UniProtKB/Swiss-Prot annotation:
Superkingdom per UniProt: Bacteria
Cofactor(s) required for function per UniProt: Mn(2+)
Species, as recorded: Bacillus licheniformis (strain ATCC 14580 / DSM 13 / JCM 2505 / CCUG 7422 / NBRC 12200 / NCIMB 9375 / NCTC 10341 / NRRL NRS-1264 / Gibson 46)
Residues annotated as transmembrane: none
Protein EC: 5.3.1.4
GO molecular function, one term: manganese ion binding
Keywords attached to this entry: Arabinose catabolism, Carbohydrate metabolism, Isomerase, Manganese, Metal-binding
Protein name: L-arabinose isomerase 2
Cofactor remark: Binds 1 Mn(2+) ion per subunit.
Pathway listed: Carbohydrate degradation; L-arabinose degradation via L-ribulose; D-xylulose 5-phosphate from L-arabinose (bacterial route): step 1/3
HAMAP family the UniProt entry points to: Arabinose_Isome
Function description: Catalyzes the conversion of L-arabinose to L-ribulose.
NCBIfam families: PRK02929.1
Gene of this entry: araA2
Amino acid sequence: MLTTGKKEFWFVVGSQHLYGEETLAEVRAHAQAMTDALNESAVLPYPLVLQDLAVNADKITSIMKEVNYRDEVAGVITWMHTFSPAKMWIRGTKLLQKPLLHLATQFNESIPWPTIDMDFMNLNQSAHGDREYGFINARLKKQNKVVVGYWERPEVQQQIAEWMDVAVAYNESFNIKVARFGDNMRNVAVTEGDKIEAQIQFGWTVDYFGIGDLVQYVNAVTDEEINRLFAEYADLYEFDYGTYSREDWEKSVKVQASYEIAIKRFLDDGGYNAFTTNFEDLYGMKQLPGLAVQRLMAQGYGFAGEGDWKTAALDRLLKVMSRNQSTGFMEDYTYELAAGQESILQSHMLEVDPSLASNKPKIIVSPLGIGDREDPARLVFDGKAGDGVVVSMADFGTHYKLLINEVSAFEPTVPAPNLPVARVLWEVKPNFQDGVKAWLENGGGHHTVVSLFLTTDQMITYAKLVDLEYVVIK
């Protein structure tokens, strides 16, 4: 996968000098034990690194400043072991520019009624400290995440893990660079958007390139490189020659291999991690990139068709958030309206992400009725089953809006022998009529990113971090 580099999270435990050094030593020991256990749980996707105790304003401010300038630190998790006066937290929290999670827990799971005394109460007063700390975060409008529950429980650790994925994606959002090969598809409305506002609000850089810039890279690819990649295809996919001669079929597939090499090289040379194409901008190209795009999406590059840079950036963002698991660009195509079977067929003219495949993809070559080019190669497969979210972002002139619809995907049961593209099927929540109606009334686009790994809660967490209006349909 196209990686984001090593990331870690800092664990900052709140207390104060009031309780004396003996108590603080116990706080440190408990904090270290928690850190070690959480790291050893195999639930958290990124390591947790314990910091000095947060016992005064200067220490807290120093920690938060360091978090900001250290790129490997993706966010902060705080825990109030004792009461920690919140005025100490104001400046550091205001300065913090990375995601913050308040873990409302305590070291011990139960109250030891036979032995509890005031020493125990002074040491273990997270309920007291949580409310003081929670107030100042709310007062500062910090949009921090709050996770509540005993820290050893799997469901609590899972919530922390899911937030970590969001925090890493939030940081990566400011590194998203989209290369647009050609412009938007003519006359399409929802793919347009304010690139300046997107860079201000989300951190996305969007650059245009004429298709000739890519053609130069394609022409520089060698036969040796193409043949080596073609051999890799043979190991990974089924070859379906259809009605083509083997020679013509391989020739078509090798065109896509040259595109994969060229596009990846172009993106990597420019520091881009997402891209768009447009079937209306293919001067100098033999085919519309299909198999090439699918392969690059599988490697973690964001993509959307018809110049839709917003969805390409969103695709990259959610691929980082999901660690590139069961997440990809999608387009609504056809309704199934039979009573009791209402669902929506998802696909695209070529570029369906193989991270959504339930079976071994096969490479086929088939005509494409648009673009006026040679028959392109593409991967064909059936989509996997699972619950997830489908997400769309649109520019409404005054603001961006994120639509989040919960869906249940299912594997197709009826063959489609004449369909030359991959297919994904899902039912929308809460039901077909209300789900589709809400999507349309709120201006949801036909280009989306679907994830069978991520949750609605994660989408909301990200939206709050970037002050993005959102609508949930579930």
